[in-house]
């Protein structure tokens, strides 16, 4: 469905949905996913993706093991965790290949090495998702020829304009779209959304790499 165009030295995918705060699409993973999929044959609404991922029905809060120490983490509300990504991939019938590099020094994530793959995806009309300069999920929808510069649709750019970012400045996460399968039928989509709502409430949570726990559902309240 997507159309790739050239504007001087810019190679762009047309029609990617704009992102921004104050649009009732504050979960950046789902907002970026809706935007990226909008130019494919697997376009789904923000609301549908929030439902089937379980994020619409999830309360999560991180607390550190040391009661005198940190008791909140900014990652508490984010959507791009393994469980939610897997749920969405199953629903849309499209594998999301997630590359996370938090173990590398800040600012040295190495995604410039992936520039040929990013550009090839854009050339094929398929956006890529990543963290930009700020760790909110963005959509790579274009690039500048003969450079390392990428065009991002993100939550922090000016309306009507993309954000120009070097491939060396993105990360530490990137998501490529991989193999396709059948997506859920409408009744299965609804059924899975209800199931995840119950699962999120009954699940007590899970331990984090940093000493602490992500509490879910009733345990998080």
Sequence positions of predicted segments:
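Mixed-charge, Lys/Arg-rich low-complexity intrinsically disordered regions
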Residues: 101-120
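Cys-His-centered catalytic/binding microenvironment captured across papain-like cysteine peptidases
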Residues: 2-105, 123, 129-135, 143-221
């Amino acid at each position: 469905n997507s159309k790739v165009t050239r504007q001087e030295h810019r190679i762009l995918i047309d029609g990617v949905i704009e992102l921004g705060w104050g649009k009732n699409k504050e979960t950046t993973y789902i907002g970026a996913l809706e935007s990226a999929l909008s130019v494919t044959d697997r376009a789904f609404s923000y609301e549908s993706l929030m439902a089937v991922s379980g994020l619409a029905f999830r309360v999560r809060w991180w607390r550190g093991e040391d009661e005198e120490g940190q008791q909140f983490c900014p990652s508490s509300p984010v959507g791009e965790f393994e469980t939610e990504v897997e749920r969405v991939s199953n629903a849309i019938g499209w594998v999301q290949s997630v590359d996370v590099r938090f173990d590398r020094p800040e600012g040295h994530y190495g995604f410039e090495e992936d520039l040929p793959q990013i550009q090839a995806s854009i050339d094929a009309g398929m956006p890529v998702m990543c963290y930009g300069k700020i760790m909110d999920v963005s959509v790579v929808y274009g690039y500048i020829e003969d450079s390392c510069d990428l065009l991002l649709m993100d939550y922090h750019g000016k309306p009507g304009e993309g954000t120009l970012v070097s491939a060396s400045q993105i990360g530490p996460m990137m998501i490529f779209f991989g193999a396709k399968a059948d997506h859920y039928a409408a009744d299965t989509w609804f059924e899975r959304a209800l199931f995840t709502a119950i699962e999120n409430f009954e699940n007590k949570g899970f331990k984090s790499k940093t000493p602490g726990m992500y509490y879910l559902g009733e345990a998080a309240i």
